[in-house]
Amino acid sequence: MRIGLIIASYGRPGLVRQLLSSIETQDRLPDEIVLSVVSEEDLGGGSLSGLEVNIIYSSPGSCAQRNKGLVFLQDRVDIVLFIDDDFWMSRTYIKELEQIFLTHEDVVAVTGLVLADGATTSGISVAEAERYLEGYELAPAPAIKIRDVPDTYGCNMAFRASKIRDLKFDERLPLYGWQEDVDFSAQLRGRGRIIATNLLCGVHLGTKKGKISGVRFGYSQVINPLYIFRKGNMSLRRASFLIFKNIVANAAKSAFPEEYIDRWGRLKGNMIGLLHVAKGKLDPMYALKL
């Protein structure tokens, strides 16, 4: 099977170089690597990697950049793998991914185990990620776990290419595209199994550089789930839970916020979002005006 890897990146040239170097250590290399960026500034100077990398340019935004990658790959591959530009894969990740799709013909999407997720903390350094992975690979192999899930986690998710040729990420979810992974993979329900497995694993650094403003993200925390619900790709219960959880967290922690989270900004964005909901306005693109 031919495997295509798509990486969308913005404002992190140094990190991208480190990521590509880590990909060189994979037991099984991807057949195509697509790096979707906004400008040459996202690449830095000099050679990127010893790997052959297809560089494409896109308007900014996770969804737009990933869609550009999908258009580029088209019929070139059998599996499309997306990873964030701060996701470090275990050495066997791509090799195991190929075997999953070969041996489970009913699987259309798969997401791997995140050993540590810096998105929920102040972040994880590359050195720390490598230590996590080294420890995992040296430890006795755990029991294999494969379970059906409703959707994939955007930092590492792969799809059977033949099942997504008519799909695209919704570019009305701008910037970081919060919940775009749920929205995209929900379109695959009825086409086959969506699974999560510890056969694939990695570390999500959760790098804070290049993230959007607190106000914009707070707005998206309210509007995006309801917008996706209205499309039929998220239950009202889940959308409501996400909104409630985030508003409570932002309000509770705004007095003594974490250094790496703009709680006041997020809370302000939440309030603007709630006001728009009360007015019957569900436009994720409004975040660009904040």
Regions found by a protein language model. Name each.
Residues 63-79:
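Active-site nucleotide-sugar/metal-binding loop of Leloir-type enzymes
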Residues 92-126:
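Conserved donor NDP-sugar-binding/catalytic core segment of glycosyltransferases
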Residues 112, 129-149:
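Short, flexible, basic/aromatic active-site loop/helix in glycosyltransferases
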Residues 151-159, 163-167, 174-200:
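A short, conserved alpha-helix in the catalytic core of glycosyltransferases
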